[in-house]
């Protein structure tokens, strides 16, 4: 007797499987070899699954001891709390005599780009759900202090449009940029991606949304040469365009931060000055066909106490109902630095929760959105494997 899978056309089976959440399908793959073959080595199908499946939105934290943990928030009741789950350890670092100490993480649709301020000779792109990794050598550069971002563009394949990934490497506050192509396994220098007087040294934060990278930048528009705006880098054109903020003529913010909402919108945290409310804005739409066309909606305006200091590099994200926001910041007390998460709602009541370890050294702790996916990491030359 034929199994159900054998009785159904492959196209229909694929369509059904593409509706199953990634974590559930991951378990099913281990019990059905035929279903496992549908996804193993098929980047197009894995990408199609990400576009059509129900998303499972999770949270991750990078602690100041260079370790990544899933984190869950309990926002019900009168005492909000958080819980750190088991540490995520990529296979290479777990078995290596010299572990890779991650100090910066960028999330891009289920993939994590991890870099280290202690070892800038390499970065790793990692899918925590599947365990797949790709280590990339970054070469010898003039000085330390580089940042790396990941994104993609679509290119035509024999069967469909597929995502092709790239890395962007840069020194903040300079005009030096390089780009890495996953398929060709090569780096090259980029010129003129920002305005002559522009700078992305304003903040260390960046986020990835729909394949593009966003930063805070200064001096990137001719009309407002000294003001702060958002800058979007397009990995297809390899150019950047300014994206106007809700406040378009500011030379300085008391606090500013970036986040992504449910993988389809940008969110910014802005505080104009020390006496102003802390505002959370979310994009309604970002017009991909015109330069910087965007509209914003203010979803929260918080009147925080002066002792709660939010800087330009602290991370945050919104709760699903956009009524609660979580900030991650450092609390400096004498000779100790502790990572804190502040949970704040519309009532302005602040819940402080410490996590991580008390250390003066270490990386900046962050919290970030994460969506488990079966997206496969592009190998050099298409499907060819290569060593690390």
Curated annotation (Swiss-Prot):
Induction: Ethylene treatment has no effect on RNA, but down-regulates the protein levels. Disruption phenotype: No visible phenotype, probably due to the redundancy with ETP1. Residues 2-48 form the F-box domain. CDD domains: F-box_AtFBW1-like. SMART domains: FBOX. Interacts with EIN2 (via C-terminus). Negative regulator of EIN2 protein stability. Double knock-down mutants of ETP1 and ETP2 show an accumulation of EIN2 protein and a constitutive ethylene response. This is F-box protein ETP2.
């Amino acid at each position: 007797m034929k199994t159900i899978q054998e009785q159904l056309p492959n196209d229909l089976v694929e369509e059904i499987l593409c509706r199953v959440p990634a974590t559930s399908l991951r378990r099913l793959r281990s019990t059905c070899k035929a279903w496992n073959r549908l996804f193993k080595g098929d980047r197009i199908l894995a990408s199609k699954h990400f576009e059509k499946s129900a998303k499972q939105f999770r949270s991750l934290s990078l602690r100041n001891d260079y370790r990544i943990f899933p984190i869950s928030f309990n926002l019900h009741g009168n005492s909000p709390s958080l819980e750190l789950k088991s540490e995520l350890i990529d296979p290479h670092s777990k078995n290596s005599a010299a572990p890779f100490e991650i100090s910066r993480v960028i999330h891009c649709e289920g993939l994590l780009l991890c870099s280290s301020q202690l070892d800038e000779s390499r970065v790793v792109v990692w899918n925590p759900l599947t365990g797949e990794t790709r280590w990339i050598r970054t070469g010898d550069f003039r000085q330390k202090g580089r940042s790396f971002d990941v994104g993609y563009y679509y290119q035509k394949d024999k069967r469909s449009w597929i995502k092709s990934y790239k890395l962007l490497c840069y020194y903040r506050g300079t005009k030096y940029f390089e780009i890495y192509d996953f398929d060709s396994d090569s780096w090259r220098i980029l010129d003129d991606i920002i305005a002559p007087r522009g700078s992305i040294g304003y903040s260390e934060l960046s986020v990835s949304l729909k394949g593009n990278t966003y930063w805070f930048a200064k001096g990137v528009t001719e009309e407002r040469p000294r003001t702060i705006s958002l800058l979007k880098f397009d990995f297809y054109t390899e150019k950047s365009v300014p994206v106007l903020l809700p406040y378009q003529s500011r030379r300085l913010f008391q606090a500013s931060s970036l986040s992504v909402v449910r993988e389809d919108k940008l969110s910014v945290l802005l505080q104009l000055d020390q006496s102003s409310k802390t505002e959370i804005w979310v994009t309604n739409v970002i017009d991909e066909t015109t330069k910087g066309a965007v509209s914003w909606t203010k979803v929260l305006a918080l009147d925080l106490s002066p002792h709660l200091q939010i800087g330009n590099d602290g991370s945050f994200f919104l709760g699903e109902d956009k009524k609660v926001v979580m900030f991650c910041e450092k609390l400096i007390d004498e000779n100790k630095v502790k990572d804190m998460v502040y949970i704040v709602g519309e009532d302005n009541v602040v819940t402080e929760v410490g996590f991580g370890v008390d250390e003066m050294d270490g990386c900046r702790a962050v919290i970030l959105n994460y969506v488990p996916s079966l997206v496969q990491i592009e190998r050099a030359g298409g499907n060819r494997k290569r060593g690390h």
